[in-house]
Design a protein with these regions (language model features):
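PP2C/PPM-type serine/threonine phosphatase catalytic domain
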Residues: 1-211
Length: 211
């Protein structure tokens, strides 16, 4: 799971931490052996619980007014991965024989322009409004998340990241580093170093899983 908080440094950190903790609290209320029974319903409940926790804190704590967070998460059960996202943190599937595939679609101003054919993916990375998101966890009393189902093959990589990475590196660069970067931990460190060297903020987050 990756959450990228907003609303100032302090409030953003609170939002992202609270979202993760609340999500896991709801998830752990159901026995792990039952997670596969209805994963979409389970993930939706987890997101709704996290959203309520962040939203209630934002309206009752003056220091947290207006805070929110993105969220991208994956529930991996054997060869199946169930991915959710809110905001502009991303999930990628990287397969050596096929390259990289972006699984999620950003809830952002520039993504809407891309989907309408008014902006290319490359131009979107440098657009002045690239950081404006249209959906965030905790921004309102209810939240809608997007859900995706994947089948993972042996050797596949599933990468989750905040926009600090995707704003600095294009998909092909990410794919190359994952496929040629060695062990997953080493690869994550390399991706973080590259993003930071190109001017990414301190809160770049990457999670990498290999099947």
């Amino acid at each position: 799971m990756v959450c990228d908080g907003m609303g100032g440094a302090k409030a953003g950190n609170i939002a992202s931490r609270l979202a993760v903790e609340s999500f896991l609290t709801v998830l752990q209320q159901q026995a792990p052996q039952d997670w596969g029974q209805n994963p979409h319903e389970l993930l939706t409940r987890c997101v709704e619980g996290a959203n309520q926790a962040v939203f209630q804190r934002s309206i009752h704590d003056p220091d947290c007014t207006g805070m929110g967070t993105t969220m991208v998460a994956a529930l991996v059960l054997e060869e199946k991965a169930y991915v959710l996202n809110v905001g502009d943190s991303r999930a990628y599937l990287i397969r050596e024989s096929e390259g990289i595939q972006r699984i999620t679609r950003d809830h952002s101003v520039v993504e809407a322009l891309v989907s309408r054919g008014e902006l290319s993916q490359e131009a979107a990375r440098f657009h002045p409004q690239k950081n404006l998101i249209t959906r965030a966890l905790g921004a309102e009393a209810r939240v809608k998340c997007d859900l995706y189902d994947l089948t993972l093959l042996p050797g596949d990589f599933l990468l989750l990241c905040s926009d600090g990475l995707s704003n600095q590196m294009d998909d092909q660069e990410i794919s190359y580093e994952v496929l040629h970067g060695g062990p997953t931990e080493t690869c994550c460190e390399r991706l973080l170093q590259l993003a930071m060297s190109r001017g990414a903020p301190d809160n770049v987050t990457v999670v990498l899983l290999q099947k």
